Amino acid sequence: MTKTAQAPGIESLVVTITQEIHVQAPLETTFEALLEQLGPYNEKPDGVAMPMVLEAWPGGRWYRDLGNNNGHFWGHVQAIKRPTLLEICGPLFASYPLVSNLQYRLVEEAGGTRIDFHHIALGQMDEEHKTGAQEGWNFMHEQARKRAESSASRKAEGRAR
C-alpha cells in the first residue's frame, strides 16, 4: 500500500521576520558595522565566534569558510547600494530545501540610523529553526548596533582632540 503525505498549506511554508533597529551612529558607520558583523566579526548568541565571508558586491557570496575548501554557503548578494541597502538571497543556515531573502534598508534619522530588516523564507522550516532564526537575528543586530555606536564614539573622541 502506498501512503501519500499531505502537502502543508502555503501559510506554513512562509516565514517572515521583521525588525527595526535604531542605532545612534551615522548612516555610513552603521552600514560598515553591519557588513563587519555579517562578515568577520559574526558570532553565535552563545558568544562562539562564527566568522563569515561577505563579498559586498552584486553576486558576491556570503559563506562560512572552514578552511581547506570546506564551508557552508549562505547566500549571494542580490543588491547593494552603499550605505542604504543590502539584500541577500540563499539557503542561509538551512541544509534542507529553503530559500530566504534578507533585506536591510538603512535610513538616516534624527540622532542616527534606522535599520529596517526583513527576512522572508519559503520552505519547510521547523519550529526550532524559526525560533533560532529570530533569536539569532536579534543577537546579530544588537552586536551590529553596538559595533556602530562604539565606532561612532571613537571617531567623535578623535575629532574632539
Question: For the regions a protein language model found, what residue spans apply to each?
Answer:
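Short acidic N-proximal helix/loop "leader" segments that mark the beginning
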Residues: 1-18
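Beta-strand/loop substructures that line and gate deep hydrophobic ligand-binding cavities in soluble
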Residues: 92-139
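A conserved amphipathic terminal alpha-helix motif
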Residues: 2-3, 121-161
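Short beta-edge strand/loop motif at the mouth of beta-sheet-based domains
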Residues: 18, 25, 36-73, 83-85, ...
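A short, structured loop/turn motif at beta-sheet edges
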Residues: 23-29, 78-84, 105-114
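A generic structural micro-feature
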Residues: 11-13, 54, 69, 94-98, ...
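Hydrophobic pocket/interface hotspot
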Residues: 30-34, 62, 77, 88, ...
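Hydrophobic/aromatic beta-strand elements that line small-molecule binding cavities or substrate pockets
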Residues: 19-21, 52, 74-79, 100-108
